[in-house]
Amino acid sequence: TRAQNAAFLWRAAGCPEPKGTKLPFTDVPAGSWFEKAVCWAYEQGITAGTTKTTFSPDTTCTRGQVVTFLWRMHGSPEPNSTKSPFTDIKNSDYFYKASLWAQEQDITAGTSKTAFSPNMTCTRGQIVTFLYRDMAEE
């Protein structure tokens, strides 16, 4: 879920204390297990929510969303390439640069040589694998 993904990233970053707990999201309850993670992710620009007032913590994440969160966690670096090996993404997709970056960093090779499957649900196992590969590079 989006809450789990935020928590995974927050923990991978060392559980930094957010500057505050004031969020625009009405669906992140004070004291919830994911509140600090979402606050941190929001402050870092990793997520802006699904609307101005909702985070949608129980919504599943897609592969496109997960690599975008991870890419933003790294400061949204420009990928080295501008051409994707994946035929199922367009350069106008919000996750385009994130998917290029993740592929270049060996975080993901896609679901085949030519498919990234950006709209496929990203499982907990896949999220942890992406994080493991990302952290192995550091």
Annotated model-derived regions:
Residues 2-36, 47-64, 72-97, 109-124, ...:
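Feature responds to low-complexity, polar/acidic, surface-exposed segments characteristic
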